[in-house]
């Protein structure tokens, strides 16, 4: 035992000293960006900047999280309520196209959400630098700093840019190795209606958000830039800032709007922008830089991943992507994993807005899909990595948004459906619209709020924060209240179902390309989401000792929901009827919600459903849009197939270039739908974590889906439900050592493909008594009489229990 304790102590020291080379966590290039998807993103959640790194002309494209078109508005259609009974009748009669036409006439409105918008850019023009040599630029995601370096003649010029988490401004540091050689002009360009003026030592841009779909532009934004020069002289005019003959220069850039909250735009953009800059300019550059790095690394350094490295890792980043499928650059998977964490830290901090389809980076007035919050998969995917990759605080902006949506969605539920509670359809914006967005084919899906409530419950399972659960419970209850009133008895089956609704962006006859209707009743995803919502609300009700009668009502409704069904192709049915097309490779795999991110399909308790879900995913194919690939990585991880998950990773890491515009990763590692959507980056990061650690199915499963390509490696800092922080080491594609750090204590149940030994370990027996680990009690699936059910082939697992105490660590190793 003494010897084993020494081994554990050595392992603790080994894990604590784990340090991936800084070069492995940099994106670097030997030429400036020429297009936006080559520029490098920096952000502090509120401010975003894309750094092009030009020598003769540098562009710093600017965003502020509250610069949106339009203003406070609603998009409820009061005609919906009267039309609802007839729409339901048409659906139940199988007249889906007629039902969808009625939805279009009575649910749609001219307002489909407002667009996220750019401020514009700050341009830095350097005369005579056009023919620079020895060029280099990078983004160091261990420090959240972008660097540009080059030579003009014998002079070496260097720029550092970061978006300070502490001072809430963008800071640019320019130096040269020869005194008096820094000369440039700074000016703004913007597609907004704007004006530029001088204000003391500052150059100020005042802009206005645009009108959109009849909603006047309510946002006013002010950007201020000030130069601190060392040597030389500075002239500020009404158009630009001119710097001549300086030794070094620091630029401070602030931006702020009049946005207060979704219903209040009475703020003072000038006062806020000025205040940020007043404070920031008092600090020396070195202090500001040090404080920024410390804040960022407090979050980023919690997780370290080492999958090995190779000579290929020395290539420029876009070339690494281009050659990834040759199979030699294993550490690119590490960089991409940590890049997702970097982007989440940079786009979602407490007190701010949630990351939208663009994160916070957008160079347009009309971004793809308006850069809004699409909630039939995309917004949820943005936050899949938050808890498991040890970034729980990045989840909080989404929680605040949910609180606000529960307020606006209450009016939508009453006006459009005559229901209690609150509802959200498939899209929203900064103004928290909750009515139907876009056409009926996409928009007739009232489950957005229900799905998002899963994030409230998962945050509780990972953190054990009962005070948070008490605040979240009214939101969950409100969403449940809506469905308790909205569900209707199916006249044929007797189940309680959603109607009207759809399986996102897909119908039994195809998608929008086939002009097919999507409006149906009780599709599988809806049933799974409502089951998830009711079950989690019921648990929260019991934990908080709330209304027992309400809990009983929830349970009765759970019992009346449809079961999952296995169809004639041995697939998990997408709809109530067995009408799935096995040749469809549609991007949405909505009926697999119960597999991931839900936990309703377990290989150990529901093997037939598990195999049916696998068959459905096989039918959908391995190619997809970027975000869909991100989802499929997670799904194959849940299916315990690491090699198939890695194959999907290979499909994502394909470079978008002129010769291959259908690639899935841009040169700056942004995910490509195409075009850019940030959810694919977050889906990838969550998927890698899911391959290495799972905790949804009654135990912590160690290395559940490790691919052969990652035969040796180490991970530190992943978090399991119940607050168990997990460090692992493996070789030969098998777990060798693990340390568990217990934040909350309680029973720790481990699941492993190899037998383990360690102090306090005992063979697991019976149900896991830790309340943060749950097993869903689902109905027995209905199975088509046309098939012989298939059972999955599963690896043998070993399960152990050990009782833990808060704040203590526990070491185990392979026998």
What is each PLM-predicted segment?
Residues 1-9:
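Bacterial N-terminal signal peptides that target proteins for export
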Residues 327, 369-373, 386, 436-447, ...:
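Alpha-helix capping and helix-loop boundary segments enriched in small/acidic/polar residues
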